[in-house]
Amino acid sequence: LIPDPEKVRVWEARAPAYDRLCRRWEIFSQLSNHLIDLLPASLQGPVLDIGAGAGLTSKILLARYPYCQAILIEPSEAMLDIARANLAGRPAKFLAMGLDRAAEHDLHAVAALASASMQFLDLEPAFATLARIIAPGGYVAFNLWWHHWEETAKRAMEGWRDVAESVCREAQLPLHVLPSRTPIPKTRIELTNASRRHGFELLSEHRDEYPTPIGFGVDFQAMEPNWPVKGCAPEVREALLTRIHELAQGKLEPLVSTRFLLQRTTEGR
């Protein structure tokens, strides 16, 4: 549960670009809305937003559930600064930390949400911690993108790569391949064992496919300032990105995400 310092540094640097990405592309609000759809309409009280980023999920939650309050947990202070601005005047608490430090704040909530963030956590300690926060009868709702769930991990969403490679060939420049580790997807056995051990019951599971413009993948990659070509002049980079978006125009590919709703039932077994 302890945040990886390197990942935190990456998202610190990306915070403004990530906020712009969330504003430009509706996929993030779709994911958050569909996750919130799983919660009962009568929900009232504090709701934990795990890996809250720039506060989009909490903003949607508070608009839909006027008797809830948001507790945003996010290890990137730069992200939380943006979230504070996005949620100004709303009933929200901001904690710059990982879920591992929840005990320090004696947190209690009627539900927890994790949109596009549960993949960063080990499920066993995560549910152990949530069992101390969520009272019996409370809820945990989270989603996993295709490559973070074993049953969809073979799906691909890399249309951006084809158009980027094409543009770089036109320009006779090398496409900068960003370093990345192949994610280890969560497994059903892992989820079942961790949740049941700490008193959570799986109530529902939904797999969603969102037809998503390839331009979204382009902008996601472009949060890295050395993409698509490392070390090029700003005006060259801008021209390359414009051309990539031209080639991506009108092209869609499915973004697959699986969402889960669990309920806290017992003290664990």
Regions found by a protein language model. Give the residues of each.
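Conserved class I S-adenosyl-L-methionine
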Residues: 1-41, 56-60, 79
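Conserved catalytic/acceptor-binding region of the Class I
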Residues: 125, 139-209
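Class I SAM-dependent methyltransferase SAM/SAH-binding core
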Residues: 48-50, 54-102
